[in-house]
């Protein structure tokens, strides 16, 4: 079959279980596509054909023996922030250019245990700090919808790989929108789960109180399949929560859109810089949900103006602490011929980290320094609590909150956005991480340049099933999630 890449996860699982094709055939199909198409997209940083085919053969044996899981034999790509035993894990940084992890992240461990086949590792912004995937040490990834545009970030490689049909689904991480914004830019569905729902063990840390892993795929149904594998408590992650798990696939039709109260924050739709096409597509998608029986309720989120300053104190402060371990001594990049220990520290860090990472370390170190700790970091944590309370108050009257995932569609690679402009572009996503809430992006159309637009739905704690179900039903009534970029239509 030449069009295996057009099948949904459910169709792939059915095809494998009914022996219409083997995992080896499916894996070879994707490896051929990667070899042909990825030189243009540049989504993969490491492709692992030998390991992938070994895992595919093991999956075929399990399928034959009748001891397969629901997803045995289906390939996927991992963001290069997840530690993978025996495979390079760089986090997009020169600092970790030659780092090979001695163990698997829990998410990777779980995908392997479920019989999924690892195609390779995909590109990202350096240490997940960025919204474009341009800050990666290996270079920028292209958006499959327009190769001279960014795919978003930091999980831009994950989004580009799925959008170009170079993987059926992929893992991502989200610290301030890094699943939802690239999903929006590339026309995909992407879920950021509640903080603590998916283990962070083996994820290279950026901001430990904000980082969360999640699935990126074409549809809510595809995301639900991957969530069934990766969600759950992990004793190796102290922030992982012991809470009963949902069957996300079985629950896809469990939330009725009829009678659903969707909160529309006034402040979100009056943000300076909100693109007219983005606003129009999001409003059209809300009209569709209203036609399906939902009620649109105007709400106030009065802390909106505090999102960006609060996030850009807390996230860099945690990054400054987490990245202090890279010193040129134990592992990671080490400068050549240091004059003394201080020279080793200084040069290893200044040569190993890119400008955006250095900028955030600098901001964070300043915010944590003795004279400014109370004025900046402690105050930001207090405001963070107010942001969380703002959401909880809203959820007393609505079931979910709607917003764009980003104020614009994808912009050109190299567009001279200054860092502050870039940070302001995160306005719709960062508060979700500050509050630890779940949120999902769904594709809802295109702008005048045929670039995808995304709708973000924010849920209350532990409502991943509800979010997936709402988007699944929306996708039963629309076809935006089935649209493909021209490059994805190419056959290998």
UniProtKB/Swiss-Prot annotation:
SUPFAM superfamilies: Amidase signature (AS) enzymes (SSF75304)
Example of a GO cellular component annotation carried by this entry: glutamyl-tRNA(Gln) amidotransferase complex
Superkingdom, natural source: Bacteria
Catalyses which reaction(s): L-glutamyl-tRNA(Gln) + L-glutamine + ATP + H2O = L-glutaminyl-tRNA(Gln) + L-glutamate + ADP + phosphate + H(+)
A GO term for molecular function: glutaminyl-tRNA synthase (glutamine-hydrolyzing) activity
Assigned keywords, A-Z: ATP-binding, Ligase, Nucleotide-binding, Protein biosynthesis
Coiled coil: none
Enzyme class, broadest EC rank: ligase
One Pfam family linked to the record: Amidase
PROSITE patterns: AMIDASES
Active-site residues, Swiss-Prot/TrEMBL: 79, 154, 178
Key word ATP-binding present: yes
Record-linked InterPro entries: Amidase, Amidase_CS, Amidase_dom, AS_sf, GatA
The EC number(s) this enzyme carries: 6.3.5.7
GO BP annotation list: translation
Subunit details: Heterotrimer of A, B and C subunits.
NCBIfam families registered for this protein in UniProt: gatA
Function text: Allows the formation of correctly charged Gln-tRNA(Gln) through the transamidation of misacylated Glu-tRNA(Gln) in organisms which lack glutaminyl-tRNA synthetase. The reaction takes place in the presence of glutamine and ATP through an activated gamma-phospho-Glu-tRNA(Gln).
Assigned protein family: Belongs to the amidase family. GatA subfamily.
Protein known as: Glutamyl-tRNA(Gln) amidotransferase subunit A
Source organism (scientific name): Acinetobacter baumannii (strain AB0057)
Gene transcribed to yield this protein: gatA
């Amino acid at each position: 079959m030449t069009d295996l890449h057009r099948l949904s996860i459910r169709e792939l699982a059915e095809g494998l279980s009914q022996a219409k094709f083997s995992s080896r055939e499916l894996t070879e199909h994707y490896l051929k596509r990667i070899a042909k198409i990825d030189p243009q997209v540049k989504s993969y940083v490491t492709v692992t054909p030998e390991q992938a085919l070994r895992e595919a053969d093991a999956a075929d044996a399990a399928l034959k023996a009748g001891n397969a899981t629901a997803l045995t034999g289906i390939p996927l790509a991992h963001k290069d922030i997840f530690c993978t035993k025996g495979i390079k894990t760089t986090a997009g940084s020169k600092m970790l250019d030659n780092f090979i992890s001695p163990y698997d992240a829990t998410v990777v461990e779980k995908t392997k245990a479920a019989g999924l086949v690892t195609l390779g590792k995909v590109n990202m912004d350096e240490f997940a700090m960025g919204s474009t995937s341009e800050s990666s040490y290996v270079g920028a990834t292209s958006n499959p919808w327009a190769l001279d545009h960014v795919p978003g970030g930091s999980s831009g490689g994950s989004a580009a790989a799925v959008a170009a049909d170079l993987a059926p689904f992929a893992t991502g991480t989200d610290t301030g929108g890094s699943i939802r914004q690239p999903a929006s830019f590339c026309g995909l569905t992407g879920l950021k789960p509640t903080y603590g729902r998916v283990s962070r063990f083996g994820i290279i840390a950026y901001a430990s109180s904000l980082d969360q892993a999640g699935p990126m795929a074409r549809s809510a149904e595809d995301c639900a399949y991957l969530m069934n594998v990766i969600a759950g408590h992990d004793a190796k992650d102290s922030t992982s929560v012991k809470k009963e798990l949902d069957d996300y696939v079985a629950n896809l039709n469990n939330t009725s859109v009829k009678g659903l109260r969707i909160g529309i924050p006034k402040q979100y739709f009056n943000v300076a810089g909100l693109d007219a096409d983005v606003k129009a597509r999001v409003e059209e998608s809300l009209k569709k949900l209203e036609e399906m029986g939902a009620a649109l309720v105007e709400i106030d989120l009065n802390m909106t103006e505090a999102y960006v300053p609060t996030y850009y104190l807390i996230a860099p402060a945690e990054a400054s602490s987490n990245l202090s371990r890279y010193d040129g001594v134990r592992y990671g990049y080490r400068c050549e011929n240091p004059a003394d220990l201080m020279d080793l520290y200084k040069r290893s860090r200044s040569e190993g980290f890119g400008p955006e990472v250095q900028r955030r370390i600098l901001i964070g170190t300043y915010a944590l320094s003795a004279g400014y700790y109370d004025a900046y970091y402690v105050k930001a944590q207090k405001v963070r609590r107010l942001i969380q309370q703002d959401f909880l108050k809203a959820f007393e009257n609505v079931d979910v909150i709607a917003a764009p995932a980003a104020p614009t569609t994808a912009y050109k690679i190299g567009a001279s956005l200054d860092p502050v402009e870039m940070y302001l572009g995160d306005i719709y996503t960062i508060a979700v991480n500050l509050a630890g809430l779940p949120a999902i992006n769904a594709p809802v159309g295109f702008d005048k340049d045929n670039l995808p637009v995304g709708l973000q739905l924010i849920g209350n704690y532990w409502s991943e099933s509800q979010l997936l179900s709402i988007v699944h039903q929306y996708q039963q009534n629309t076809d935006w999630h089935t649209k493909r970029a021209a490059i994805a239509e190419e056959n290998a």
